Amino acid sequence: MTQANLSETLFKPRFKHPETSTLVRRFNHGAQPPVQSALDGKTIPHWYRMINRLMWIWRGIDPREILDVQARIVMSDAERTDDDLYDTVIGYRGGNWIYEWATQAMVWQQKACAEEDPQLSGRHWLHAATLYNIAAYPHLKGDDLAEQAQALSNRAYEEAAQRLPGTMRQMEFTVPGGAPITGFLHMPKGDGPFPTVLMCGGLDAMQTDYYSLYERYFAPRGIAMLTIDMPSVGFSSKWKLTQDSSLLHQHVLKALPNVPWVDHTRVAAFGFRFGANVAVRLAYLESPRLKAVACLGPVVHTLLSDFKCQQQVPEMYLDVLASRLGMHDASDEALRVELNRYSLKVQGLLGRRCPTPMLSGYWKNDPFSPEEDSRLITSSSADGKLLEIPFNPVYRNFDKGLQEITDWIEKRLC
């Protein structure tokens, strides 16, 4: 079946699909202060989703393309769940968030199929994969249309990997007590085995969202990158996120001695946002298997335990947390109680001495990750490094921060 036909089969025009903003039924606290964050984007009036321009541009999407798709959503006069929120159009049709981003992805998919130059075709496939992932954002459990977009993103990513420089292998890892999980091992040119970074992504992203990190930062230094999806999404959707947040990544780490392309004696973990919760747990529980752990905007304590901090977070992000925990119908009080159990300080880890070198990068006044969380991480490590990343100019400083983090990782791996 061709990719185009697969798209047509998955996205049959039906209007009974649940609309994304209705999937998590929590008590709404009403108006919230505007939020802006380098890693998560910003709240914009009349949008349910946070608009994450920096990360979308960093992944290769043209800013004009973002505005074009947003304009199509805004101009739609189709029925909405909430007339005040543009991105709540009901059903897979014009104006629906998933429809418009998937339609944009199909344009690039068609370009990829028509392009004869393999590398350029690979770029177009990668572009399509990124757009399908934005269509599925924020990846809430039970969002049928989003799951179909994720399937198309994975397919496009596999097509891209066959054409782009280096080698990518799709790998299956066995996890006792449940379904196996699938990861992608990205390898630079040259002969392995390679020093490898195990990527621990955020809760509102997919493992295929981090190709730019590999291509721009790790590959030029001869470092491989291994990704897996976080529990409850993508290829890890059959696994619920629990307080043992690092369970899947631990089983992957333990399997690395049997992967011939990976130098299992030179492995680091890198955690974005809640992925840092996973990475820091690994630093404590699997220190003999890790040379270093780096974190960026870590969610390890304050957001999980401080009610005032939770009140500053947009509804969409709280919906993501509730969805990952399988608490779609829980009260806000029940969600707060459960989130507290995910704090690595409450679990008795952070604050104890950890032998693994740990770096943590942060932005001042980050609503998701205050400086204190990063200080807690680095002060707990026998070899800690704190990295403040200035906010403006946001893109340049984000790139500079990633270069510094990669330098730090490279020194400990190579």
From Swiss-Prot:
Asked if Secreted is a keyword of the record, the answer is no
* Role description: Catalyzes the hydrolysis of esters.
The protein's annotated catalytic reaction(s) are: a carboxylic ester + H2O = an alcohol + a carboxylate + H(+)
Name of the protein in question: Esterase FrsA
Q: Which UniProt keywords apply?
A: Hydrolase, Serine esterase
What does the sequence similarity comment in the record state about its family?
Belongs to the FrsA family.
State the source organism's domain of life.
Bacteria
Which source organism? Answer: Escherichia coli (strain 55989 / EAEC)
Q: State which Enzyme Commission number(s) the record gives.
A: 3.1.1.1
Looking at the keywords, is Ribosomal protein present? no
Among the GO molecular function terms of this UniProt record, one is:
carboxylesterase activity
